[in-house]
Amino acid sequence: MTWFIDRRLNGKNKSMVNRQRFLRRYKAQIKQSISEAINKRSVTDVDSGESVSIPTEDISEPMFHQGRGGLRHRVHPGNDHFVQNDRIERPQGGGGGSGSGQGQASQDGEGQDEFVFQISKDEYLDLLFEDLALPNLKQNQQRQLTEYKTHRAGYTANGVPANISVVRSLQNSLARRTAMTAGKRRELHALEENLAIISNSEPAQLLEEERLRKEIAELRAKIERVPFIDTFDLRYKNYEKRPDPSSQAVMFCLMDVSGSMDQSTKDMAKRFYILLYLFLSRTYKNVEVVYIRHHTQAKEVDEHEFFYSQETGGTIVSSALKLMDEVVKERYNPAQWNIYAAQASDGDNWADDSPLCHEILAKKLLPVVRYYSYIEITRRAHQTLWREYEHLQSTFDNFAMQHIRDQDDIYPVFRELFHKQNATAKD
C-alpha cells in the first residue's frame, strides 16, 4: 500500500498565499468598505464574515501597450467584416456604463460593477480591530499570574515516538552510513577497476582474479551489514516551557438605561459595547468584563441581561460609579489588575448628581484605573454631565470623551478611543 503525506503549508487551500497578498495590497480599500458595512449590521451580527466591494478602478494594474497615434498595419484573425481603409465607428458611452449603480439609466454604453468578494470571520475581525489596544496596559509580574507556553527547542536524542522527527533521523542515518562506508566504497571501487583490467589482460591471471573477486564480495558484505537505521540516528522534536507573564485586565461597562434613553440610543450603545466585547475577547486572553446597568439605581448584571433587559427608570449616574468603586475594592486589586471602564449615556442626569460624579471619578476611580472612556450618545446639546467631565479630561490623562450622534459615528469613535499607542507602559 502506498501512503502520501501532504506536508504543504497550504495544501488544503492552495490559493491562501494569493489571498493574503491581495488583502495586504488592498487593505486600505477593504478597511474603508468594512467601516461602511459595520453600521448596516444588526446588533447581534457583528462577528460573522462580510462581503467586501472594491471600486474596479482601484484594483486596475499597470500594463504595457502601444502608444496612441502613428500608422500601424495589423492582421486580425477571423475578420470578415472590414477591409483596409474602412473606418470603424467609435462606441458611444452612456450614463449606464459606469457600473457603480449611481448613474442614470441609458440605452447604450457599458462598464463594470465593483469587485465584490467574501472575507472570513477571522479576516473580518483582524481588519476591524487592527492597530487597536487597551491603553496603558502594564505587565503584572505576579507568581500566580505567570503562565507557561510550550515552544520548540531544537531536537533531542531521547523522546516519545509521537515526537520523532523522521526527516532529521533519516539525515543522521545517511550521514552515519556515508561515514562508515566511505573508505570501504573507495577500496571497492579500486578493486573493481583492477578486476576489470586483469579480466581483459592476456594471458589470464585466474588466481589473482579469484582473489579480487573474493575481496570484492567481502567488502560488499561489510557495506551491506551497516544498518540502514540505528537508535543512534533517532532524533525527537524537543519542546520546552517558557514563562509568559500575563497582563490581566478587567473592563467595566456602564450603560445608562433610564427613560431618556430611547430605543435607537440604546441600540447604538449596545453596538459600541458589542464591538468592545469582541475586541477584548479576541485580543486578550485574561480579560474579565463587568456589566453594570443603571437608572436611579445601579445593578451588576450578566451579559444577556445587560444587552436585552427592558428595565428602565430615572437617571442618577453616580449610582453606577459608586457600584463600580465597590466592585473594584471587593474583587480587583489595582496592584494586580489593569482596570478599564467604558461609560455610555445620553448625557441626561439629575443636575445635583453631576458634581458628585465628578468627585467620585476624581478621587476614587481615576487614580486606580488605567483608562476611563465616556461616550455620550445624543443629538441634543451637551448638559451638565458633559461639562463636569470636561474638567476631568483636562486634569487626567487617562480620561477620554467622545460624542456619538448616529450609527456612522460608532466605529470611528471606537477606533479613536482604543487606537494603539506608540509605547505601552511598563512597571
Curated annotation (Swiss-Prot):
Q: Where is this region: Disordered?
A: 79-110
Compositionally biased, Basic and acidic residues: which spans?
79-90
Which Pfam family name is an example for this entry? DUF444
Record's superkingdom? Bacteria
Gly residues: compositionally biased ranges: 92-102
- Residue intervals passing through the bilayer: none
Show the NCBIfam families listed in the entry: PRK05325.1-2 (NF003707), PRK05325.1-3 (NF003708)
Q: Which family does it belong to?
A: Belongs to the UPF0229 family.
**Name of the featured protein:** UPF0229 protein YeaH
Gene giving rise to this polypeptide: yeaH
